[in-house]
Amino acid sequence: MNKSNNTSNRRAERLTTIGDDAPFGNINFFTISFLSPEKVEKTKYLDIRGFKIHNGYNTLEVANSDAKELRKKYIDHDVYVTQLGKVYSWDDPTKTDSIEYEDEKLNELEKTRKEHTDKVKLMQQQFKNEFEIIRPNINTDRLNNQKKRLRDKLYSKGLISKAEYEMAETLDKPTNEIKDIAVCQKQAEEEAVKMANEDYLDENPPVGIKFGCISIYSPKFIRGLKQFCFKLRGLFESQEELEDRVNKLHKIYPNDRIHTFEVGKWIPYSDTIDDNEVSLNYLNYSMKCYLDNVANEREEFEKRKDNLQKQNEEAAKITKRKNRQEKRREKRLALKEAKNTAKTSVSSIPDTSSTTTSTNSTPTNTKSNSVQNINHQGPVELPDNMDPAINESDKEAIQNILDYIEN
């Protein structure tokens, strides 16, 4: 399991701003992945979080290219591309320079978001990427003092434990909820101890960059800060370079907490836990729960995708069936219309029975012979002396009727 050490565990004094560092060295960008247990139900009350620095780069193009490869290799974690010496919100894809997701559609959306973010940054250059610390007003101070007196009273009477007291300082929740949260936290801590022998904290293959230092800004130690922030202070090839950089930073920023770490390993951070082994156990358990959660999400996603595919296939079959029915209906209507047209054409033929009687002494036999001719001689030749009012389309319609009778 990974090891990490803190160069400074001093609790920071109140800061007015958290600003960017001046440019340093030839490494300008780096890739980082986060583990945020609060995003998983089982571990959201564990006071632990983790990060892994993958590598450092000279240019953004090289960093983005490597981030794509890292994302393919470590499919369970998003890979962020950020700039050395700048302040960023913890595990916040909307506040980073670039991020690689597993899904290509999300990557396309990220590019669109980045374009709009760049436009906003151009309009807000006066802020210089600083996180302003909000000064609490008198009313807020009075309310916080009342809450503290209530916590002290409950603790002095033994109504809440020390862990619940410390938790109430961080979480703005009623006492009964704090007790429930404390129970969940204790269960998670016990599970973490049981899982200590199984290592879920993977390590990257070695790269040229070996060590680094980082500052993590917590709302617990910086009054008025509303979110976790971090700033990578340097990446180095040797331990000597690292120590030299940390010493210089302490002289310039005496109130900053500066942590050292090894590149390519998961590093734990906690506001309340000073024991590195305990922190690693909690981070290890959090990683297991996170990986289980990712696997479940993928399984549910595949189920939803299969169900959606089946629904689409069924809908396609229904549409195809309806189309066939519509075509048959159209054919029936066309045939019916043709028959009606033929009947109309036949009814418009003039009566020539008197002419036939004067030229033929046996009309009955002629009629009989005509029927026989229909049955045995194929297509009937229409008489040349037929009324010219019957046009070619009428002749064709009559012929269709005769063919229909014959068949």
From Swiss-Prot:
Region annotation Disordered: where it falls in the sequence: 302-394
UniProt keyword annotations, A-Z: Coiled coil
Basic residues composition bias: residue spans: 318-331
Biased composition (Basic and acidic residues): 302-317
Skewed-composition ranges (Low complexity): 344-370
Coiled-coil segments on the chain, per record: 96-130, 287-345
Keyword Oxidoreductase: no
Coiled coil as UniProt keyword: yes
Protein name per UniProt: Uncharacterized protein R435
Organism: Acanthamoeba polyphaga mimivirus
Organism lineage string: Viruses, Varidnaviria, Bamfordvirae, Nucleocytoviricota, Megaviricetes
